[in-house]
Amino acid sequence: MKEKYELIFKDFYNYLLFDKNYSLNTINSYLTDMYDLLMFIDKSSNQEITLHNLSENDIRDYIKDLSKHNMSERSISRKISAFKTYYKFLIIINKIKNNPMEFIIIPKQNKTLPTVLSIEEVLTLLDIPLNTPGDYRNKAMLELMYATGLRISELINLKMSNIDLELNLVKTIGKGSKERIIPVGDYATEYLKEYIYNYRPSFIRKNNSEYLFLNRSGNKMSRQMFFKIIQKLALEKNIKTKFSPHTLRHSFATHMLEYGADLRTIQELLGHSNISTTQIYTHLSTDKLRENYDNFHSNA
């Protein structure tokens, strides 16, 4: 069924990629959102409804349906954003005259602070018994992620050519196809060298993949597989803090700030285009400061 709509969204895909300069993750999310909307239309009793004549009320009905099925506000907001972008695109290419999304507002969300591990929890998580090639690969991935603050998508898309083991640097392409170069500490670099020279060869198959971190089939590791590895380790280590795919990235930024790094440096390391995105970590550090004050100040 999904293949049926690939041609419909081909031009939209190109618009997001080349005109809007969106990341592939964002593009895939938007296309999935549009596909879900099409499924809703297909199930409609009104066979006259199409993407091009969908009304504002039709979309509002769909949004209500999502809420009834307990979809989170964040997910609904992203879908609305996808629909707005799509119908703006249809206006630009003169496919429609009236925009059904014009008066539909993206609901404001309460900013939730990202989950962060304590330094002790990070050290516990990274203390991996090294018995198999997979253990050495996982150790190198986790050490590199915590040492650099890379996003999971950036980590798994690293190629051998992106690593400079002599200068201790990693080059990555982040959101908006922006390139950045990040220093890597000696400790993480040693585990990278160990993996690359001694254990990565055991993952190489006939395809001889150029990606740095490989699965047992010799292909690039998926986001899902890497996150499962982290979750499994956290469970084994009895780490109670709730995990998200970016927990190590958030922990990297927060610990950098706590140890005196300035906000602008952290912004550059994380690849944030706007420093306001980075400022959320100041709230985390303030919360930690308050906790320590309450625990240790005699008059707190």
Give the ranges of each region predicted by the language model.
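Conserved catalytic core of the tyrosine transesterase superfamily
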Residues: 1-300
